[in-house]
Amino acid sequence: MSTNEGSLWGGRFADGPADALAALSKSTHFDWVLAPYDVVASKAHARVLFRAGLLTEEQRDGLLAGLDSLGSDVADGSFGPLVSDEDVHGALERGLIDRVGADLGGRLRAGRSRNDQVATLFRLWLRDAIRRVADGVLEVVAALATQAAAHPTAIMPGKTHLQSAQPVLLAHHLLAHAHPLLRDVDRLADFDKRAAVSPYGSGALAGSSLGLDPDAIAEELGFAAAADNSIDATASRDFAAEAAFVFSMIGVDLSRLAEDIILWSTTEFGYVTLHDAWSTGSSIMPQKKNPDIAELARGKSGRLIGNLAGLLATLKAQPLAYNRDLQEDKEPVFDSVAQLELLLPAMAGLVGTLRFDVDRMAELAPLGYTLATDVAEWLVRRGVPFRVAHEAAGAAVRAAEARGIGLEDLADAELTGIHPQLTADVREVLTTEGSVNSRDARGGTAPTQVARQLSAVRDTSERFRVRLRR
């Protein structure tokens, strides 16, 4: 049987909890990451207690000095949780009492509950975490942009259904991976508006009767506002679920980039060679160069999705207000951040060191009759209805396929035999360069458009960097 010594809640109980309950309740193995935030919030709380007349100036200063000492010891690792500590809050109260005594140290708990305390600390931690994750995502975007800038005219096969479809610029394709990642960063930045609401002062659920000032502590801790409803503030974790969704979306977007790299690095595609420092070998096959980073990105995306699903399942159908189920809210989010902090630098390094075989891509770009759409649209520009033009282009493909040649190899007579307006002039679009250059509308794959896209990606990235530094 455990004792209640050092517990934040033992007065009502004659005995301590059963050992199995104590083990089940323990959370210091994961919530210790909140310790620095707990110290900062406790200092703000001491100042609020002083302004409310609940501490003398001497008591306030003594608590602040003790918290400064405790914070330094937490930072350098000389103070940590004991086996007997239930959670980060109890461990830090123990540390504070060791430094300032039980009478003074015990005064800090006035006006706050672990319910509002942990909800506040979780938000503080998460607001910092999303900035670190966003920085990592922007590094991947920067690597994609650098590769796009290095290959402004390289042409590759564009695909739908993994089948050759139309020629596109490699830079266009790379930037197509950058845009969803930038939207993820936008989601993180937008999420911060909802995370920047402080639950502090809500108490267990009903608020405080001690004359505390939630707005003052919210401002001191860098929040935009204090919560409007104390029950909602202590019981809701939609902010955690929203963050977990964005983290999982980042994982999904990285997994699509990863899948492209995996395919491109195969012998069958042959688009890229992986740098030695960003790939691995085989313990039995000497020739292998494996895309482990990309494969781990695919795998970790599943883990991130699982963290989101698990968190949503935990939150489902909980009655108001706080329930102990919410002890399970942090580990999925902590894990998602930890996985992304491992993955994002590796993905940036992988992308930044890819060596593209532009000749191979250019050779494959027209194969599979990828210029057929250009034939149809060439006819449309000459007044032929698209339905008819589509049929004519399809007939040209069928004729070339029957002879085992490309569209460009059909004789002039064969072309006009398919459709009278399909003259020799169509050959101006029967090159991959002509095809790419013709797609000069906004968002298209023409070099002028892709250059604009690259500039926009870089400008947007920089705006996000500035915004996230605030």
UniProtKB/Swiss-Prot annotation:
Organism classification: Bacteria, Bacillati, Actinomycetota, Actinomycetes, Mycobacteriales
GO MF entries: argininosuccinate lyase activity
Sequence similarity: Belongs to the lyase 1 family. Argininosuccinate lyase subfamily.
Subcellular location: Cytoplasm
Annotated PROSITE patterns: FUMARATE_LYASES
Alphabetized CDD domains for the sequence: Argininosuccinate_lyase (cd01359)
Broad enzyme group: lyase
Keywords: Amino-acid biosynthesis, Arginine biosynthesis, Cytoplasm, Lyase
Protein encoded by which gene: argH
Species whose genome carries this gene: Mycolicibacterium vanbaalenii (strain DSM 7251 / JCM 13017 / BCRC 16820 / KCTC 9966 / NRRL B-24157 / PYR-1)
Catalytic activity: 2-(N(omega)-L-arginino)succinate = fumarate + L-arginine
GO biological processes: arginine biosynthetic process via ornithine; L-arginine biosynthetic process
Pathway: Amino-acid biosynthesis; L-arginine biosynthesis; L-arginine from L-ornithine and carbamoyl phosphate: step 3/3
Protein name: Argininosuccinate lyase
